[in-house]
Amino acid sequence: MSENKQLMKNGMWSNNPALVQLLGLCPLLAVSSTITNALGLGIATLLVLVGSNVTVSLIRNYVPKEIRIPVFVMIIASLVTCVQLLMNAYAYGLYLSLGIFIPLIVTNCIIIGRAEAYASKNDVLPAALDGLWMGLGMTSVLVVLGSMRELIGNGTLFDGADLLLGDWAAALRIQVFQFDSSFLLALLPPGAFIGVGLLIALKNVIDSSIQARQPKEEKPAIERARVTNA
């Protein structure tokens, strides 16, 4: 398996930051009440992940090991500030909706974890691909969880898409069910916990099913050496 395919498999499935590593749960649970919010935070996290991995990989040979963590945090904070300013300028409604969770990307364990575990030990291209696939893995879980919660809670999909994509995206809103009142359990953090648990359980079931279909490798017989005389 090529390195890119292995990185893709790890980021999207085998070592998914949300479903396997269980990192970044605070924004995952708090922001994913709609697809729009989930996608907005996912894109922001993806941009910071790729940017931080590339930057850390470029300077990895010039930063003393004793101060590498503070340097990584400063790099991540600078990139988050850039993303925050861009979102404030071009997606102000989404910026207000996400609120404090945009600057909190600085403390996201996914980003500092990939910078320390992978980017600081590899060249630029593999580090960029690692950030890309880990970011896409996190974004995919955010979007799936956001769609589940929005659909069950409000009976809609892509509500508020205009906050992210512009006024034309208001036409993307789909009313799947008509509720007299919102189902608050799905929209509040307890519903997010339940949703994440269901997604983790589903992944484990799929992994077990795939594992069961794999041919079992026969263990070679172990020959014991005789230590006594005949």
Curated annotation (Swiss-Prot):
Entry membrane topology: Multi-pass membrane protein
The EC number(s) this enzyme carries: 7.-.-.-
InterPro entries for the chain: NqrDE/RnfAE, RnfE
Protein localization: Cell inner membrane
Membrane-crossing segments per the record: 18-38, 39-59, 69-89, 93-113, 124-144, 182-202
Swiss-Prot/TrEMBL GO biological process terms: electron transport chain
Protein name in UniProt: Ion-translocating oxidoreductase complex subunit E
Gene from which this protein is expressed: rnfE
A Pfam family matched in the record: Rnf-Nqr
Protein task: Part of a membrane-bound complex that couples electron transfer with translocation of ions across the membrane.
